Amino acid sequence: MDPCSFDIKVHVAAIGGGGGATHVLRAVAPFAASRTAIIAVTDTGRSTGLARQIGAMPAPGDLRATIAAFASDQVIAETLNHRFDGAGVPALAGMAFGNLLIAALTRVTGDFAAAVEHTARLAGASVRVLPVSVANTTLCAELVDGTHVTGEFEVRAPGKPPLARLFLGEPANAYPPALDAIRSADLVVIGPGSLWTSVLACVQFGGVVEALAHCRGTVAYVCNSTTQPGQTDGYRCIDHVQRIVAALGPGVLDVALINRSNPDADALRPYEEEGLHLLRPDEDEIAAVRALGVMPLVRELTGYVEPRRALWNKQDTIRYDTGALGVALHEVVMMKGKTNG
């Protein structure tokens, strides 16, 4: 995208996990006056889980990854993401240095948000990175059979009954500056990313739904490119949108951006072998989204499907083309939001 082709500059907030928010904020760079990432803090993965114990703090992993993605110093970025091999200290195997740094800063300052801010300043991050909450709480879920699971790792584990609802083990409020960023944004983008453990996890904190309802701009959801084993097995696009609307309440979500690309079968095969299936809406789904009071914006968002990446303790998915995503989100900006037109 040519930055000169955009004659307006808007304030953008992206809500979710580190990967999705990073992708969105890169995509909107040509037309963003400011960019804020509001990041999930309930991860309990191996590196993050241990760092949480060390720092007695919320999950730092997605925050660290987001800061590194926008670092002005590449050496600092690589250092934040550097994972120890455990040589001599097996307990540190796979530990990201940035997670330890945030844990240490939290212990020194007594303030998790300040620790994140110090880390972002050290990296020279070009976007504002905020935790959705500073509460050290646990993500829990009720399954359709009525049983409960505790901890983000268990919530996303495959091979269990479908998820019915999320809740926090210890109810907590959102971080006030994150709520301010949501309310003042011209565009709030929810997703893409793990529907339950990244996107809906952020909504569990007190104040997030209300802030979205009172956002001065447009609230958009970017639907995922594929299903995700353990979270959205068997889901269609409409199922994703319905979950978001159910969590936010009627009249809050303005736009659902949905991918309609149809990649080559050979490119899809490695993903399908891992249980991920392409999401493409049919006309009935598009009509159903509209019936929810949400504007469906269906666009081709994937170009060349890159080879699957080996992610630490996570599963890769098909990534959207940054340019195509940016053009589509600019379309969203040009639409009239619920309060700005």
Which residues does each predicted region cover?
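Structural motif
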Residues: 13-14, 189-191, 220-222, 257
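An anion/phosphate-binding loop that grips the pyrophosphate of nucleotide cofactors and donors
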Residues: 185
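Hydrophobic/small residue at the entry helix of a nucleotide-binding pocket
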Residues: 20
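Electropositive, gly/pro-rich neighborhoods at or near active sites that engage anionic ligands
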Residues: 42-161, 316, 320, 324-335
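Glycine-rich oxoanion-binding loops at beta->alpha junctions
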Residues: 166-179
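Conserved phosphate- and dinucleotide-binding cores of soluble alpha/beta proteins
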Residues: 2-9, 26-32, 36-58, 158-160, ...
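Glycine-rich beta-alpha junction loops
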Residues: 41-45, 135-137, 145, 225-227, ...
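C-terminal functional extensions of proteins
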Residues: 2, 234-341
